[in-house]
Amino acid sequence: MSNEFTHLNLWERTRAGIGVSFALFWIGILIVAACLAPFLANTAPLFIIKNNIWFFPAFELLKFVDILFIILLVNISIFYFFRSKINKLFSWLVLSVSGLLLFLAYIFINPLQLINYAKYRSLEYNSGIQFKIAAPIQFSPTDYLRDYGNTSLEAPLDQPTSDLQINIKSKDRIHLFGTDENGADVLSRMIHASRIALTIGIIATSIAMLIGIVIGGLMGYFSSWLDILGMRLVEIFESIPTLFLLLTFVAFFGRNLYIMMVIIGITSWSGYARYTRAEFLKLRKMEYVQAAIVSGIPLRSILFRHMLPNGVAPLLVAMSFGVASAILAEATLSFLGLGLVDAPSWGQMLNQAVNSATFNWWMALFPGGAIFFTVFTYTLLGEAFRDAIDPQILHKNN
């Protein structure tokens, strides 16, 4: 019975949902942008030939996190496009090679601490340059264009106005989404900020789901005193205000993305526990569960292999809202000025829309739109998964 919901045309039924194509398209854009950010938005050229010698300046600026996202994209591509041909041995081989590459990157990569972006811009006028390949957006997220003079808060497609900007020995710069208050390109920062949105949403929700499924499954399966104790624990955690707890930790321990993810995860599991408990209370009386118990199947297998797949429908909807809530929580902190300082964030950029005497519409439209569409697409996916797995909807459609 469990295989019916996890393997039987699940993907085809999910894709048939309303708006799923748009949701997958948007999330795909976010994944590609997050994983290939250094190659999509970078002041340093990707490749140059100077005096018949090849150089890769952009690779000088790569950090460990950049390698992590690149390897993640490669793994996703392999497991998606070759899913029908992958066996267990090949999977372990791919994961082992990926782990080895990450270990080597962590040991040997030593990125530059102080970056002179003007040096990379001047390469364009170097007489020794024979060939150059630049990133589509030739501005890094922390490139504040100091060599151009005062470049703060320029609207999209604005032309340079100050004498220093006009007379500088460089081609006219174009910012499709404008610049922020520090002069950094907004589109470049949005591309790099997609990493925080995806990371905090997925990891925080995964932590919450793992805790909630384990506790909720035990509550629903055993019931009695364990159920009562678990419900009291759920009520305690539901009374904890996540946002105020985040503010407290930021005040005492500084601005740390990993602490944010853990706090959001350990304060958001109660909803998953309630859903899992309700489903397991119903499923534990089913004949196939009783047969599994009589057969002597281990408890772990009964709970998570036979019962969980048949009670996962409410969790998928809750998961979509959980990812959205985690993204909104981080955006709220950044909007309040308590997010990460150096790393770009959508909430941080949204704050700059009203952070001066005038309303900077581009700082509200583009980061705010990114937050809205990301939250909206996760909601669409959750609803589509619910409809694809729900046996009542399947019976009605048939």
Predicted regions: what they are:
Residues 1-209, 213, 353-368, 372-377, ...:
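Gly/Trp-centered helix-boundary motif
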Residues 179-398:
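Alpha-helical transmembrane segments of integral membrane proteins
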